A protein has these predicted regions:
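N-terminal helix-loop segment corresponding to the beta1-alpha1 unit
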Residues: 5-101
C-alpha cells in the first residue's frame, strides 16, 4: 500500500474496544461520508442501535461540526452528540491510495 494521508481522530462517546455492541443492528458495518447534521444524525442513530459506524472526514479540520459553538474547553456539544458511538478517520479521498483503504 502506498503512503495515504490519513489521521485518526479521538471520538468522544466512543465505546471501549472490548465492549460488545448490543442492539438489532449488531454486526452491520456503516461508512459515513456526511457532514454537519443530516448524514451524521442518521449514522448516529444506526450506531445507537448497534451498527459499527466509521466516519470518513477530510484531512485537516475534519467535519465542520467540530467547530460549531465551542465550549470553554474547546469541544462542541453538537460534535459530542453527533459523533457518539462512532469511530473516525481522516482520509484524502482524492488520493488513490486513500481510496484503497
Amino acid at each position: 500500500m502506498s503512503e495515504a494521508r490519513f489521521r485518526s481522530f479521538i471520538v468522544i462517546g466512543m465505546q471501549p474496544k472490548n465492549t460488545p455492541k448490543l442492539g438489532p443492528l449488531q454486526g452491520l458495518k456503516v461508512i459515513e461520508l456526511g457532514q454537519l447534521i443530516a448524514g451524521p444524525f442518521a449514522a448516529k442513530t444506526l450506531a445507537d442501535f448497534g451498527a459499527e459506524v466509521i466516519k470518513i472526514e477530510p484531512p485537516g479540520a475534519g467535519d465542520p461540526l467540530r467547530k460549531w459553538r465551542l465550549l470553554k474547553d474547546g469541544t462542541s456539544v453538537w460534535w459530542q452528540v453527533q459523533s457518539r458511538n462512532k469511530r473516525s478517520v481522516a482520509l484524502d479521498l482524492k488520493d488513490p491510495a486513500a481510496q484503497d483503504i
